[in-house]
Structure formats: C-alpha cells, structure tokens
Amino acid sequence: MKERLDVLLVKRNLAESREKAKAVIMAGNVFVEGQREDKAGTTFPDTVQIEVRGHVLPYVSRGGLKLEKAIANFDVSVDGKVCTDVGSSTGGFTDCMLQNGARKVFAIDVGRGQLDWKLRQDERVVCMEKTNIRYVVPEDLGEPIDFSSIDVSFISLTKVLEPIRNYLKEDGEIVALIKPQFEAGREKVGKKGVVREKSTHHEVIEKVALYAQSIGFKILNIDFSPIKGPEGNIEYLIHLKKWPNPVEDALLEDLSLVVDRTFETLAK
C-alpha cells in the first residue's frame, strides 16, 4: 500500500502534523531510501525507509523562518509588544513572534480552520478567522498595535498597507513579504506563476516601496526571503516604520544591488 510522504511522516511520529511534515519536506530535510524528496504528495510504500536530517523546524510552519531572518538581520524587536500577523495561515509568523517575546498576537486571515491547534490554545493569541484585513479598523482590535507582519497571496501589498497603518502606533513597524507573482502584471508572470526576470523583480519592489513611502512609511530594510514560495518563486522582506508624513528620501540600498544579490544566492 502506498501513501503520501507527509502522511507517512506523521504516522511514524517524524512530524506532529501534516502541515509540519510538509514544511520539513519542502525545506529539503527528508530523505527516502537515501534520496532527498521535496514533494509532500509523492507516494511511497509504507515499508520505505524515511530519514529526517538537519535541524527540526522550530515553528508550526516554515513561514516562521522568514520572520526569523527579518528579526535577526533587520534588528527587529517584538519583545513585550502587541502584534498582528496578517495572512496568518498556519501561524508560522505568529509562532515566531511568540518565541521572540511578543505579549499578544492577533492572527488575521480570510480563511478558516488553518491556524495550528497549539496557537489556538495559547492565551496570547487572538484568532481572527474569516477576516479581510482591508476592512479591519482600530476598534476591531481594541488596542494600539506595535508591530505587524504581512504574508498575503493573490493581492498586492498596495491594497493592505493603508488599513494596517491606520491601526499601528505612531512608531509602529511592519515586516512584509513582497511576492512578485502577485505584484507584477499578468503578462510578466511566467509558467506556473513564476516571475523569472530580474527587471520585473526590481519593478515590483520599487512599486511597493514607493507606495509605502507615499502613505507615510519609511523604508528601513529590504532583503530576500530565505525560503522560496510555491513553485520556486523568490520573495522579498521589506521592513517599514510608520512616519508622520509621506517620505521622499531614497531607499537604503540601490534596488538593483538587492535583486542582483538575491539572484546570485537563490536563482539556481
């Protein structure tokens, strides 16, 4: 009898849940009969030899590794802060915030039933399912927010930054994922939704950054996400700080250098 690789990992107690199993598999840490396997849906006989190598994923999903990089490289602190995790899904970002000392996290997502059970049970987490961030107002949260992460799909960041800015404290900060496949025009997105042209990456980062500046955010940092998105899409982390007025100063680093460094590292 054959079963999916993620199911086999759970059955053998090599992962706590199928979501965690998928994360470990996609991270390239699972070997079947000595060969690396990175597709959770591949089926194998239930007698096959499976080995998990490398570090155990410290969060409920691999998304936590993205925020972990931002916290480390951008000198972001969430210790003792009230946060929102916009596009929370399973809760990798929420988990990362809690493990870095966040006092409270509002996990906001348009979907339902996705947030990991461990986080649902945590009294520091407020689960806001079936909630469209575009219509969230400060009164819905009931308290000022110090920090927000954003990891949304099928929508541009230019549609969600302003409502989040409205509920942030005056010195509030954001770490958001820029996903070229959801920012570029349809004609610039290739097969399987992958954006391969460097010039398009430059364009979409610039578009998001200039928009953020125009509504009162200062760009503090931009770097690539350590983990690719579905189908191998390269994504970027942008670090923003709420500013009293529109910001016209230049970006910290020439965007072409950011994109060049990203492609040298990830486009293999």
Predicted feature residues:
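Short, glycine-/aromatic-enriched active-site segment of Class I SAM-dependent methyltransferases
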Residues: 180-197
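Glycine-rich SAM-binding Motif I of class I
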Residues: 91-92, 113
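A basic, amphipathic helix-loop patch mediating RNA/tRNA/ribosome contacts
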Residues: 1-48, 82-83
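A short glycine-rich, Lys/Arg-flanked "PGG" loop and its adjoining helix->strand segment in the class I
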Residues: 158-175
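Conserved class I S-adenosyl-L-methionine
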Residues: 78-89, 97
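S-adenosyl-L-methionine
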Residues: 106-159
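Flexible, glycine-/basic-rich loop-and-beta segments that form/coincide
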Residues: 234-268
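Conserved S-adenosyl-L-methionine
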Residues: 96-104
